[in-house]
């Protein structure tokens, strides 16, 4: 009986955490740290970004904006569901771009990249914010980061973690709804 009580307390703590503003704030801070790392590699270490890297940055900025807005909005089930849905789309987009970059880097992919971002004229972020979104290199390899992982591998791991965090929040939302109904 004691194990069930302990498990229930742990589940409640995890659920409360995943439904809190702190969760969204943490996701926003992690996203900002990832962007700061990319800019450090670009401007301090001289590692210029390619088309796929910039597309990954766009997904990351989308995720960061969703997380920031969700941290500021009232915590209602509807808004939480919409926010989690948007965050999931951004995180999955980031995983896809990371996987594509990983494949290119390791000679597994069947693709390449260009010196243009490839966005329509009405969404010319590379012209509006060239310091953040201008393509300056062709895809080939990404620099090494911590633990001998390449930037593509690190990004793939981080993006997968983001997807799991959002899925956890969605599960927590469903869990609280099911608990309230019973």
Give the ranges of each region predicted by the language model.
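Short, Lys/Arg-rich, polar N-terminal cytosolic tail immediately upstream
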Residues: 2-19
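Structural signal for the C-terminal ends of transmembrane alpha-helices
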Residues: 68-76, 164-174
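Membrane-interface loop-to-helix entry segments
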Residues: 52-62, 129-133, 146-161
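Interfacial segments of alpha-helical transmembrane regions
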Residues: 16-29, 75-95, 164
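Short, charged juxtamembrane terminal tails flanking transmembrane helices
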Residues: 3, 12, 176-182
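Extracytosolic (periplasmic/ER-lumenal) interhelical loops and adjacent juxtamembrane/interface segments
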Residues: 105-152
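Non-cytosolic membrane-interface motifs at loop->transmembrane helix junctions
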Residues: 47-57, 83, 112-114
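C-terminal TM-helix exit segments that contain a strictly Trp-centered aromatic cap at the helix terminus
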Residues: 33-42, 92-108, 125
């Amino acid at each position: 009986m004691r194990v069930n009580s302990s498990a229930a307390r742990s589940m409640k703590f995890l659920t409360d955490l995943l439904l809190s503003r702190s969760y969204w704030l943490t996701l926003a801070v992690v996203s900002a740290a990832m962007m700061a790392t990319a800019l450090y590699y670009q401007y301090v270490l001289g590692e210029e970004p390619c088309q796929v890297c910039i597309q990954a940055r766009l997904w990351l900025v989308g995720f960061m904006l969703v997380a920031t807005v969700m941290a500021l909005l009232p915590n209602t089930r509807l808004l939480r569901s919409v926010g989690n849905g948007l965050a999931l789309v951004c995180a999955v987009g980031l995983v896809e771009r990371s996987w594509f970059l990983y494949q290119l880097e390791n000679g597994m992919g069947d693709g390449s990249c260009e010196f243009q971002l490839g966005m329509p004229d009405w969404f010319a972020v590379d012209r509006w914010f060239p310091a953040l979104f201008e393509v300056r290199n062709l895809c080939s390899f990404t620099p090494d980061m911590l633990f001998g992982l390449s930037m593509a591998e690190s990004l793939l791991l981080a993006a997968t973690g983001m997807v799991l965090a959002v899925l956890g929040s969605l599960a927590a939302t469903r869990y609280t709804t099911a608990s309230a109904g019973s």
